[in-house]
Amino acid sequence: GDILLMRELDIYPDETAGELSERLALLGATVLRDTLERLQRGELIAIPQDSLKATRCGRIEKENARIDFSKSSVEIHNLVRGMNPDPCAYAMIGGEPLNIWRTKLCETGNPAAHTGECVIADPKKGLFVATADGLIEVTELQFRGAKRMDAKAALNGRNLKGCFLT
């Protein structure tokens, strides 16, 4: 439809879809109020939407949330952010799903590692997984049947070093 009023909103580098949705809801309420007031005063002119710039998103299925570690760290990080909170990005480990709630981009990599390999899995250092172009740190995760938790805490009593996430 036609556009009456627009506002821009920056997306933060580590912001999840859920966090962005909350900020958009607050902004949307303000913009709606402003739009109705300005429309009532006759201050707005409808501008036709450019159909070439309009985009559509298909239905997001659970399988869309599966992480492919042969992709770049940035692509994986953005997938995790975009799938949080629902349906939640995941990978498989030992035939079981592992929900990955948050990640952090790393500046260094491990060229000898294979994609999906848990290169560092230490309760003090964290969980670092090999990607197509380096490493990504998993900072918050959830094993099947367990609660969502900080990755370092989740690694207590678990030895994932050398394991593969698929």
What kind of region is each of these model predictions?
Residues 1-106:
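Active-site-proximal loop/hinge segments within enzyme catalytic domains
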Residues 64, 69-166:
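An anion-binding loop in the catalytic cleft
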